[in-house]
Each structure stands twice: as structure tokens, then as C-alpha cells.
């Protein structure tokens, strides 16, 4: 009897390594595939591609599977990184990991896996897939503290039908235990953090390579200039660290936060206090939608939504655009949400089931009547 072939995306980390081992133990014909999505440059201090590949080969040798490497750097640059730069240039804050999953890990990788004779692919993501009534559902992981369905919401039914997430039913602590018990050489390797192509390098230094600095005034809601920013692209809504203000001499002494990026006047507006009304939104509008469930919720439906990773689901009402052909949607939250950021994803849930979502275009904050006279209306963050 021919074994069912599964190609596992292996990164050199513990999660994908345990995924490959679990599937091998379950009797699958497992092939490991290492994706190189970023060309190494002069950042040897930060790029770990070489060591990651060594770890993949070591793990594959231990568990007894074949492994190969494939270079998707060109596809990544065209489909993910170019969009990443466009969004930052426009003053928004994108999430490239969401786009990477949809365009690279579950498109380019899936296509390559099928060419290797695979019936299914698998990754080390913490999520679950369930088939029900001829459709495939994306569910949160059993371990909600590690759930990664937020990053997977742009997958479609075809991609989901060919995908396995073996770690979706397992707590992260158990994954580490398995890695140690079977003697994986990377059992104690730290989880990767940050944007995949940036790694551990300083984000601002990296971004400055591709986007020019364009200094401008940093102002308070009443129009007082309190400093100078280096370029709006280098700040994000709700940012606290790296603003360069500290406590204001004549202010409240509370921390400063980025509140508005005014593209027209190249002005960065900052406010003091985590609970400032300029940082909270009851409504948002999202576009560039994708429904992993196959279709959007009904107009007026109640659901939960995340506007950032690891955020608790926020109860809200879903609204479809009134104009025919407009696929955008609105969300009205029961309670104001903090730092709802254009460029990030608004992802909808019905309990554990991920419905899909879209890219946040705008969010209404408590700024009505408080804007300084003459301020341009082209506000990007929480406009």
C-alpha cells in the first residue's frame, strides 16, 4: 500500500521539526522542504538562514526523512516585500506575515509540494482544519495562547483542503517535551520573533535602507510642537518606544504615544496617556477582504474580531458595504478598541472558527472637535 505523501515546511525551528516527526510516526511518507524567502546580505549578524538549514538537515537525518531546499526569494520580493514597502510609504503599518502565508507558504510552497507528488502539505502553525458539510473550516489552536489563525485568515478553501496543522491539538509545552524526548538537535532553540525577513535586526535601521527619511514636526492635539520626527513611515499608531520625547516638562508626565500621521502636512501627532481618546476606536472599515470560510458573515451578524495578533476577540457587529460591488466591511465594537491600525488585519471569528477578514483602511477615534484649526484631513492612522 502506497503511503500518503506529505511535504512539511521546515524552518529549522522546534515546531516544524516536531510536526515532521509526528507525521512520520503516523505512517505518512514525509518530505521536508526548507524555504529560503530572503537573500542573505551583509547582515550576517542577523540572518540565520545558514544555521536554520543546518538544523533542518540534522533533524531530517535524525527522524529519517528526505529534505530539500527551495529558493522563493524572487517570489517573496515581488509578492510580499514590494507591498510591504508600498504600505509603509503610504503611512500604513502592514503585516507581511499574513501576506507571506497566503502568497508564499500556501501558494508557491503548495505548488512546489504538489510537483513533488504530495497529496497534502503541513506546517508547524498552531491552528486546526476541520471539514464540515463539504467545506473546510480554519479553527483556532487548542492552545489559545499560541493560536496563529490570525496569520492564516487569507487562505482559501483550495489551500485549506490540502493543509494539515498537526500541532493544532497540542499545547506548546508538550511540543517542547516531545522535542527533548526524541532528542531533536534543536530542542532548545528559541522561537523566532519579529518579521520573517527582518529577523532580529533593528527595524528602523532595516526600513531606512529602502525608504528615505523625511523629517517633520511632532505636535500635540492642541497644535503645540514638541519635537521632530524622522519620517512618518518610521512610526506606527499606538507606538510608545522610540518617539524620543520622554516625559514632557509641562505635560502630565504620562508616556507619549503616536496618535495620527498627517500625510498632507507631514506632521506626527502624539498624545499622552495610554487611555487618551485619540487612541481608541469604536468603528473600523476594512477592505482587500478574504473569507477563508468561503463567504462573508450576514449583514448585522454578531462576531468576535481581532485587530492585532494575540488580542482577545472583541465582540462587534459586522456590516457590509451599502454600495453594490463594494466588498469592504465595517465593524462596530461593543467597547472602544485600542490602537486600531490601518494596514493591519481585522480578523473575524465565530467562536473558534475563523471566518476571514480584511485590511483595516480607517478607524473612527474620539477626535471629533479636538483637531487643531487648519489641520489637513488626509489622516492615515485612525482617520
From Swiss-Prot:
Recorded GO terms, molecular function? Answer: ATP binding; tRNA binding; tRNA-uridine 2-sulfurtransferase activity
Locations listed in the record: Cytoplasm
Keywords, in A-Z order: ATP-binding, Cytoplasm, Disulfide bond, Nucleotide-binding, RNA-binding, Transferase, tRNA processing, tRNA-binding
Tell me yes or no: is Disulfide bond among this UniProt entry's keywords: yes
Question: If you read the UniProt record, what top EC class would you report for this enzyme, in one word?
Answer: transferase
Could you say which residues bind ATP here?
9-16, 35, 124
The catalysed reaction is:
S-sulfanyl-L-cysteinyl-[protein] + uridine(34) in tRNA + AH2 + ATP = 2-thiouridine(34) in tRNA + L-cysteinyl-[protein] + A + AMP + diphosphate + H(+)
Superkingdom of the source species: Bacteria
- Active site at 100, 196
- Segments for region (Interaction with target base in tRNA): 95-97
Q: Where is this site: Interaction with tRNA?
A: 125, 344
What EC number(s) would the UniProt record show?
2.8.1.13
Task: Tell me yes or no: is Lipid biosynthesis among this UniProt entry's keywords.
Answer: no
Disulfide bridges in this chain: 100-196
Region Interaction with tRNA: what ranges?
146-148, 308-309
Q: Which GO terms describe its biological process?
A: tRNA wobble position uridine thiolation
Pfam family, any one = tRNA_Me_trans_M
Q: Name one GO cellular component term.
A: cytoplasm
Q: What exactly does this protein do? A: Catalyzes the 2-thiolation of uridine at the wobble position (U34) of tRNA, leading to the formation of s(2)U34.
Similarity comment text for this entry: Belongs to the MnmA/TRMU family.
Entry's HAMAP family? Answer: tRNA_thiouridyl_MnmA (MF_00144)
This protein is called tRNA-specific 2-thiouridylase MnmA
